[in-house]
Amino acid sequence: MFSEIIRKLPNTDISISVNDKNLFVIECEGSLYKLATMNPSEFPELPQISIENSIQIEQNNLKDMIRKTIFAVSTEENRPIFTGCLFEITNNKLNLVAVDGFRLAWKSKYLQTKVNDFKAVIPGRTLNEINKILVDSFEPIKIGVAKNQALFELENCKIVTRLLDGEFLNYSSVIPETWETRIRVNKSNLQNCFERISLISSSSMEKEKKYPVKISVDIGKVTISCTNQTGDAKEEMF
C-alpha cells in the first residue's frame, strides 16, 4: 500500500512522520494518509553473511545481462532450480544462464579483476526486483556469495537473497558446437516480424494458450508463420 500511495502522489515534496498514536503519516500538498504501523522490533534484522566469493561489475552491464536471460527463467515450481538464473564464474568470465525446458538463454561478460571460480543460482524473482533498481551507468554493484545466501550491494542499498538448491543444467553440453544452417538477418526487421506474429501466437482471446511460431529458411528468404484457432499470419524477410 505504501509504495502505491507514493507512486500516485504528485511529483513534489512529501512529508513523512509518525504521530503520537503511532500512525505513519504521509502528507503531500492536499493529500493526507495515515497508516497503521507495527512494532519495529518485530522486523527481522539484516542477516550477517560470511562472504566466500565476490565480484564487482558495472550496473549497466549486469542490467543488460539480466535483461537478456531473465525471460527464460522457468515459472514451474515443480522444478525449483530452474526458477532461478545461474551465476557462474569460469576463467574470470561471468556467465548468466536461464532455462525453462523450452528455451536456454546465456550471456557472458569478462570481468576486469581476477576472481575465483564459483557458481550460484539466484531466484528469478530476486533478479527481477534488482533489475528495477539498477541504473544505466558505470557505477559498480558488488555481488557476494555465501553458502546459501547472496548479497547484492549498491550505494546505500543492500539486497540479501537465498540461493536455490539443486543441480543446474550442464548448459554447455546442450549448446551445439557446429551448425547445419547459419543465417544473417537484419535484427530490427526480425524483431518487428516477431512482434507482429506475437499477436497471433499470444492471442488475447486465449490468454493461457501459446501457439508455436514456425521459421522456414530458403535461399534468400526467411518465412515466419503462426496459426491459431481464429486465424493465421505469415511474415517474409528477403
Describe the residue ranges of each PLM region.
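Structural preference for solvent-exposed beta-strand-turn elements
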Residues: 1-238
